[in-house]
């Protein structure tokens, strides 16, 4: 049973001058800020990442890049291409795509890593691209991994990647930042994977959805860098946009070891770079008055082995609850960017050779293994770890994503049960939708493979069964945004961008309105649909009454996690076609937010407004789409919103600050979206 304590609320204010580490890193990589502006959560900023990685999707990004009219990558040192997803596929079609990516990289002078060299995220870390206190992005959702080494890593969509290739920059809205304080020390044998699976379960009500997470507290120093990488990696499944660990002595020592092992003359792993990092680290720590949206705590010493599933990351239970159920398994997996590192392979090997001899994988069970990179596999071979795994009957796969993404050999078949040290167990992801998948640590996966059922390592090691203690954790909301009661420097408003946006609010009172509800999937791949038709089918899967309840110029208000689901850009463009200039929600899917701005649709997260409207209509008959007679005015120059009743000049019921929408972002909107902005920038530089 978990214990979550309720603690007092903290206040937060835009007027507070302190910055957290996330804001400091963004500040260092932002371009075009007005003089003296200090980046804060909510701000829309243009960013120039240190690096941008793409993998098998490099060719679609390249096609979009060329479609923008670009011919040369803006900064070849910024871009990294890796091949890691479908590396077992030897079909001519896939090999041709791989050849195209390699040729493009060679022509552009971009760093390229071929298939079977390793998973892109692992390469980014071990080759020193994702480096502490830098901003590194990738066109992949597990870019959060880089936070394990103190780099701010966050995903971008393909259009963003193409923009970075062409211009060196894209945009980002700085998310609310949640501070997660870790105390205590993990019990013997319990791993970073157990910690993040527990976090996903204990805080499984979207507490950190679309937040940047910063880990802090005395427990951090007791986690190895490999454990930090695992935790940061799965902050994606926790719902966060990044998961950042601090730069401390443990990390600096780890980098000194990497430098010692690196080939002489390595371009990025150098003693001088690590020394410079050590000098800079203190200044990049959070200020004492740094702002956080939430404060969470977790006592690591209260954890045990955790397993999530079946088919859900957020259903997490102690192994002591599952082991007695004798849940048989058919397949086990030790691989991926989550748990394919040397420490993970050694944890599994330690279970397999518990009594000095190598235990065999149970009859009828297939145990698949793959190192996160060729370098990791070489290290495992040199230490004898790989031989132990093979001697036990494990089935080796090449370094790559493979079964984790549902590609290649060893997928789950209908009726089968699998346990995996990967990051996602969504139904159908690792094979048949009629299979069941569980997630666990390498040690639990190995023990389960040996015994043929979900089992704790102690059952193989001959130790006492693990306890299932109450998890000691807490969460505190840090208050609402400050009222707009003080003077602030005016935001520059560009010609062609409205100084203020005003409209009547139309409430679509539902959480998790998905992209299929906004723009039906049956139209997604009909590229010749007229704008008028897009407007007519907008929101038809959500509410047929939306059409006659919403007029051009209205502002749509949605619930939490608006735009969840697929990455279809038409979810944004259909709303624009309907004449909606601005969508407000309690929160947005990150992909929808990016697609919205990239296609010139404005968005604002205003949970206080959503709460106000829900309270206003709490006793009214249910209505999916409701005209409210309530008006919102967004003063772009003042970075405030004002909500009034009856008319734009009526009774004021809400007035608060919002993030600054910088001139650089305004220019994207004025140019019709990110693609239009890139084309304009390329024309200007020609």
Curated annotation (Swiss-Prot):
One of its GO terms (biological process) is lysine biosynthetic process via aminoadipic acid. GO terms for cellular component: mitochondrial matrix. It is found in: Mitochondrion. Pathway: Amino-acid biosynthesis; L-lysine biosynthesis via AAA pathway; L-alpha-aminoadipate from 2-oxoglutarate: step 3/5. Binds 1 [4Fe-4S] cluster per subunit. Its cofactor is [4Fe-4S] cluster. This is Homoaconitase, mitochondrial.
